[in-house]
Structure formats: structure tokens, C-alpha cells
Amino acid sequence: MHRIDETFRRLRAQSRKALIPFITAGDPSLEAAVPVMHALVRAGADVIELGVPFSDPMADGPVIQHSSERALQRGVGLAYVLQTVDVFRQSDAVTPVVLMGYLNPLEIYGIARFTQQALASGVDGVLLVDLPPEEADEIRAIFSAAGLALIVLASPTTSASRLATLSGVAQGYLYYVSFAGVTGADRLDAQSAGDRLRGLRAQTQVPVVVGFGIRDAASAVVMAVDADGVVVGSALVTALSDAPDVDTACRRADAFLAPLRQALDAVK
């Protein structure tokens, strides 16, 4: 968790916005995961969200669903995901890594076992898209004791009372979903999202980042104005999806992310 906090402190001191790319572990190939993570850091990533493949990713659109399916067909599970982070940490002890996925794989793996191994691998936070509120406190306590941040989601349909609760318990950063729907959709409402983001930032002690629908430098800049950072997922996953080899995947990661980094650095 400390890596997330330190990263946002540094960015705030520099008046810079966080750039948070999402990739699916094991896609476009098992061999490409760690090299692509390093390529993203070189291109300007501040935090990496690493997707844990799941057979029923209900919050994800077709792009990430298919990416998850491809990874599952390659045999990717939590053990591979944690090993990927462990290998990444051998040459990058600074960049925060947040695992993003669903509760079921963790329950099957065992929450306590997962927590212990995630900490040992160098994971900094976990975002569980479908975590029921009634289970969140117990898992948050387990994660917190190990130094893992439980990243929470808020959306346009989240009630005011629920937002107040989330703002009080958020760790690492709060992830605001820019619209109600699935990942990869293209219907940003910058004004509405901006109003909500300003309100969230005023009532929570952690940074607020925004995702869903961000696909290029222009959309990243529009959404970053009222946020502490932006998450880009489906568009990046698409760019990587058919990379024939590791080198191509790394070049595509750099070519996709570098323009977003340059554009965000102009936003104050």
C-alpha cells in the first residue's frame, strides 16, 4: 500500500496526474506480461492495474471479456498472476501494482492464502469489482493487516450515503467509473463526471481516479482535469491483443501509452 501512497504524494508535489494502464495477465501471451509491464512504466505509467482473468467478468465489455477468455485458455490463474508480479518486482521495486478482478477466484484460492502470497509477491492493492458491501469490511481488515489496499469503486448510480461510506474507508485510491455500464463503452459525459469527481475529491482523503471510456490522449485529458488520475484499459488491451511476439507487444504498449503521458503532463 505504501507504494501507492508514495506515488500519489510524488505526483501531487509535481502537479501531475496519475496514468494507470490496465492489462489482462497472460494476454497477449504468457511471456509478454512482465516485459509489457516494464514497457508501460518506461512509457509513463505510474500504477499498473493487472487484470485477473475470470470466466464471468460481468462488469467488462467484449474487449476485456475476450482478453480474459484468451488468458484462461492459456491456463492463467491466480498463481500465474502472483508469479508475474513477483518477477516484475525483481527489477521494479517502485511502481505500484493493483490486481483487478472478481471475488470468486480469490474465494476459491483462499482469502488468507491469497493475501499472504500477494504481499510476498509485491502486490500493493486489490480491486474486486463485485465485492458485496457486507463482505467488504472483513476482507478490508484482512488486507489492511497485511498492508494491502482494498481499492473501492464508485459510479454515477452510487447513492450519496454510500459515497460517504466509501470515502471514509477508501484505501490507496478511489476508482470512479465514469458511467454506469461495462468497460470499453464510448459514451463519456465529461461535465457530469467532472461534477461528481470534484465532489468526491472534496470528501475523501485518498486520490480519486477515473476510468471506463478513456481510449486516447484527448479523452484522458478531458477526464483528468477533475481527477487525480485516469485509468485506460480496453483500448490498450485492443492494441496488444494480436501482438505476434513479445517485442511487438512492448512496442505497441509504448506507442499507445506515451502520447497519453505527454498529454496528461500538460494538465495541471
Curated annotation (Swiss-Prot):
Question: Transmembrane segments in this chain: where?
Answer: none
The keyword Disulfide bond belongs to this UniProt entry's keyword annotation: no
The reactions it catalyses are: (1S,2R)-1-C-(indol-3-yl)glycerol 3-phosphate + L-serine = D-glyceraldehyde 3-phosphate + L-tryptophan + H2O
Q: Which UniProt keywords apply?
A: Amino-acid biosynthesis, Aromatic amino acid biosynthesis, Lyase, Tryptophan biosynthesis
The UniProt entry's sequence similarity note says: Belongs to the TrpA family.
Pfam family example for this protein?
A: Trp_syntA
Sum up the protein's function in the record's words: The alpha subunit is responsible for the aldol cleavage of indoleglycerol phosphate to indole and glyceraldehyde 3-phosphate.
Protein's pathway: Amino-acid biosynthesis; L-tryptophan biosynthesis; L-tryptophan from chorismate: step 5/5
Record PROSITE patterns? TRP_SYNTHASE_ALPHA
The identity of this protein, by name, is: Tryptophan synthase alpha chain
Active-site residues?
A: E49, D60
